């Protein structure tokens, strides 16, 4: 089976990111083909099981000129709370993810 996992957060940070990474590992052990779309900062590194296709959405760039989105008031990395996004930021966010998702599928 081909599985695409998507998160706007960093894949190796926070509970949901670690959960995503471990889920991808479990799917890989079962022989499934994995791909991941995730938000990352310019200096982030990622490690997934061999054969996993990774499609990063780069924050802190001209296209997304703010830190990775986060779901909590306090994250273990510099982040942008969804509730603090302006309409322009939300549009940039949606556009960036749409472009990467089209490549992934």
Give, region by region, the residue ranges found by the protein language model:
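A conserved catalytic-core segment of Leloir-type glycosyltransferases
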Residues: 35-104
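Hydrophobic, Leu/Ile/Phe/Ala-enriched alpha-helical segments that form helix-helix packing faces
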Residues: 23, 27, 100-105
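N-terminal subdomain of nucleotide-sugar transferases
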Residues: 1-58
């Amino acid at each position: 089976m081909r599985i695409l996992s998507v998160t706007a957060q960093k894949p190796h940070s926070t509970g949901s990111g670690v959960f995503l990474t471990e889920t991808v590992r479990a799917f890989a052990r079962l022989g499934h083909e994995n791909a991941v779309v995730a938000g990352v900062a310019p200096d982030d590194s990622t490690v997934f099981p061999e054969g996993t296709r990774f499609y990063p959405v780069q924050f802190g760039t001209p296209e997304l000129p703010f830190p990775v989105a986060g779901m909590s008031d306090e994250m273990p990395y510099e982040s942008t709370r969804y509730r603090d996004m302006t309409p322009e930021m939300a549009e940039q966010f949606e556009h960036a993810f749409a472009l990467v998702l089209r490549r992934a599928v």
